[in-house]
Swiss-Prot record:
Pfam families: BRCT, DNA_ligase_aden, DNA_ligase_OB, DNA_ligase_ZBD, HHH_2, HHH_5, Nlig-Ia. This is DNA ligase. Residues 595-675 form the BRCT domain. SMART domains: BRCT, HhH1, LIGANc. GO terms for cellular component: cytosol. It is an enzyme of class 6 (ligase). It catalyses: NAD(+) + (deoxyribonucleotide)n-3'-hydroxyl + 5'-phospho-(deoxyribonucleotide)m = (deoxyribonucleotide)n+m + AMP + beta-nicotinamide D-nucleotide. DNA ligase that catalyzes the formation of phosphodiester linkages between 5'-phosphoryl and 3'-hydroxyl groups in double-stranded DNA using NAD as a coenzyme and as the energy source for the reaction. It is essential for DNA replication and repair of damaged DNA. Belongs to the NAD-dependent DNA ligase family. LigA subfamily. HAMAP family: DNA_ligase_A (MF_01588).
Length: 675
């Protein structure tokens, strides 16, 4: 055997274990992920060339072995007992009193307080520092051998790190999944048609009990240790807290949220603090575990049949409960999103009476297989809106009703659109829908739209709440009496606002289209549409294929435009604005400049960076006036990029694509030249 190869492999293993320790235990990585991957790939390559040098504890051996047909049973040498529970302060205080009476000690006891993780309890057996067996808790006496699966979890060291490691030690802890990992796993499952889990605990348990370790290897599992079982050929500190710190030094992850608390007040303060930070932890817990810290006192207190006397789990109120769906209603959000909401038999969840739960969208109803009358599990975590996570199908009544998603808005009866590839269905009646009214009107009068000077958000709020205005056309029918009666509006302000409304009737075609609030139609798209179609009638009659001929208009935008102009309510409001109110815009002027005089005519231009001589809006207006289309992104269709100070990725992309780039001074010169 080449001694140099063995040395390289050993050094790489030591280095990789060191960085795994820093990443998973200390949460203080020294190198970027790419460098870790490079070292790992180098080790894999050397081991592939010299398979006789592969050892079970090598960092490369986490990828997952071949599938099993069944899990072997493992008998725990020391039973993995459960904990007694406290669900209120009185029960916890009784526990503390019981301990002091048993110990014949009136002094306050010091406890090690930890998070009660909501995952799957596991046992890890290390011999001479190497992981040789992993098992589930099972019934406390017998569990399942999950060694190959656990070896794939990067947070669990295959070999302990440091000095004074016992010859044989069993570490106990919890395998769990973070909220972020859980969300990513379910997103991927929905995308690929895989199994969607109800909560992180189910996801962790299902991932850990896979017969195929290669599947487990792809799941975002992690681990915290909290105790010890078998101990042979070594010594540990006589404090539980100190033991956890020792485990951390050996490379085993330990939660940072552990604390020594002396006396009941300190313990209760810790409990309430954890309850407060619980929503921001990033993983699920269901309480606090309170353990006598002194190991000698633990041994003196001993055990009852199923639990230690020296520990208790002080549980939080449940985040999941069962209830029955009585009905489903459909709500309309301020942007027109249609959200199904389940009406429930009221039930207490996490300290709050819950009678409604979001169902998100039609896809979620289909995924759950949900019907009215079903018994369901609902979940409420932190400030998150309660949601239905699963259906208990065996409790489904014979008269359960199918949930039918509406085709018309329940508020304004406009058509509901759902574009292929989008989960959310939306009301198309943006100009008349009461649910969307405030936001639609605020957009309509905004500076880049109809530019009604003085018509602020608070005025719109009052006009809608007092039912003076329902559609954009109603704004132009307001009189001095109505306006002067609004909060903080006198006669002078009312006259000024009426003048601003009158002035706004003379606008541009692009501003008018932008003001309508068609989904996905921003300023740049409005400019492109109006430059291409020239007249309102032509744009209203355009089909999807005709719309897609406009630069930067694809399938989705084209469908939104067609759906908007096909909706009868929208047609009526547009007709009122143009025919009754008299909103007008100049007829398009055909440019007479030769190309040499006007380098912007018909060109797609992108502005990037900070401008010093003009505001971005002023520059955009002058460019559009000369026939340019101002886009927000650089692509192969871009003709010119105008780069101000601190121009970033757009400038880099323009250079990469070979697009003409000019600075602000050159833009000003060309604008002035083209007047």
């Amino acid at each position: 055997m080449n001694q140099n190869i063995q040395q390289q492999i050993d050094e790489l293993r030591v280095t990789l274990r060191h960085h795994e320790y820093l990443y998973h235990v200390m949460d203080a990585p020294e190198i970027p992920d790419a460098e870790y991957d490079r070292l790992m790939n180098k080790l894999k390559a050397l081991e592939a060339e010299h398979p006789e040098l592969i050892t079970p504890d090598s960092p490369t051996q986490r990828v997952g072995a071949l599938p099993l047909t069944a899990f072997e049973q493992v008998r725990h040498e020391i039973p993995m007992l459960s904990l007694d529970n406290a669900f209120d302060e009185t029960t916890y205080l009784a526990f503390d009193k019981r301990l002091r009476e048993r110990l014949k000690n009136n002094e306050e006891i010091t406890f090690c307080c930890e998070l009660k993780l909501d995952g799957l309890a596991v046992s890890l057996l290390y011999e001479n520092g190497r992981l040789v067996q992993a098992a589930t808790r099972g019934d406390g006496t017998t569990g399942e051998n999950i060694t190959e699966n656990v070896r794939t979890i990067k947070a669990i060291p295959l070999r302990l790190y440091g000095d004074n490691i016992p010859a044989r030690i069993e570490i106990r802890g919890e395998v769990f999944m973070t909220e972020k990992g859980f969300e990513h796993l379910n997103e991927e499952a929905r995308r690929t048609g895989g199994k969607v889990f109800a909560n992180p605990r189910n996801a962790a348990a299902g991932s850990l009990r896979q017969l195929d370790p290669r599947i487990t290897a792809k799941r975002p599992l992690t681990f915290f240790c909290y105790g010890v079982g078998v101990l042979e050929g070594g010594e540990l500190p006589t404090s539980h807290y100190a033991r956890l710190q020792q485990f951390k030094k050996w490379g085993l992850p330990v939660s940072d949220a552990i604390k020594l608390c002396t006396g009941t007040k300190a313990v209760l303060d810790f409990y309430h603090h954890v309850a407060e930070i619980r929503p921001n932890l990033g993983f699920d817990i269901d309480g606090v575990v309170i353990k006598v810290d002194d190991i000698a006192l633990q041994e003196e207190l001993g055990f009852v049949s199923r639990a230690p006397r020296w520990a208790i789990a002080y549980k939080f109120q449940a985040q999941e409960q069962m209830t029955v769906i009585k009905d489903v209603e459909f709500q309309v959000g301020r942007t027109g999103a249609i959200t199904p909401v389940a009406r429930l038999d009221p039930v207490q969840v996490a300290g709050v009476i819950v009678s409604n739960a979001t169902l998100h969208n039609a896809d979620e109803i289909e995924r759950l297989g949900l019907r009215i009358g079903d018994t369901v599990v609902i979940r409420r975590a932190g400030d998150v809106i309660p949601q239905v996570v699963s259906v208990i199908e065996e409790k489904r009544p014979e008269n359960a009703q199918e949930i039918v998603f509406p085709t018309q808005c329940p508020i304004c009866q406009s058509d509901i659109e759902r574009i292929e590839g989008e989960a959310v269905a939306r009301c198309t009646g943006g100009l008349i829908c009461a649910a969307q009214r405030k936001e639609a009107l605020k957009h309509f009068v905004s500076r880049r739209a109809m530019d009604v000077d003085g018509m602020g958000d608070k005025i719109i709020d009052q006009l809608v709440e007092k039912e003076y205005v329902k559609t954009p056309a109603d704004l132009f029918r307001l009189d001095e009496k109505i306006l002067s009666g609004l909060e903080r509006m006198g006669e002078k302000s009312a006259k000024k606002l009426l003048n601003a409304l009158e002035k706004a009737k003379s606008t541009t075609f692009a501003r008018f289209i932008y003001a309508l609030g068609i989904r996905e139609v921003g300023e740049a798209t409005a400019n492109g549409l109006t430059a291409h179609f020239v007249s309102l009638e032509a744009l209203r009659e355009a089909n999807i294929e005709a719309l897609k001929a406009v630069p930067d208009v694809g399938d989705i935008v084209a469908k939104h435009v067609v759906n908007f102009f096909q909706e009868e309510h929208n047609k009526n409001v547009i007709d009122q604005l143009v025919n009754d109110i008299g909103i007008t815009w100049p007829a398009p002027v055909v440019a007479t400049h030769e190309a040499g005089d006007n380098p912007f005519a018909g060109k797609t231009v992108v502005l990037t960076g900070s401008l010093s001589q003009l505001t971005r809006d002023e520059a955009k207006d002058r460019l559009v006036a000369l026939g340019a289309k101002v886009s927000g992104s650089v692509s192969k269709k871009t003709d010119m990029v105008i780069a101000g100070e601190a121009a970033g990725s757009k400038l880099a992309k323009a250079n990469e694509l070979g697009i003409t780039v000019i600075d602000e001074d050159e833009m000003i010169r060309l604008l002035d030249q083209s007047k």
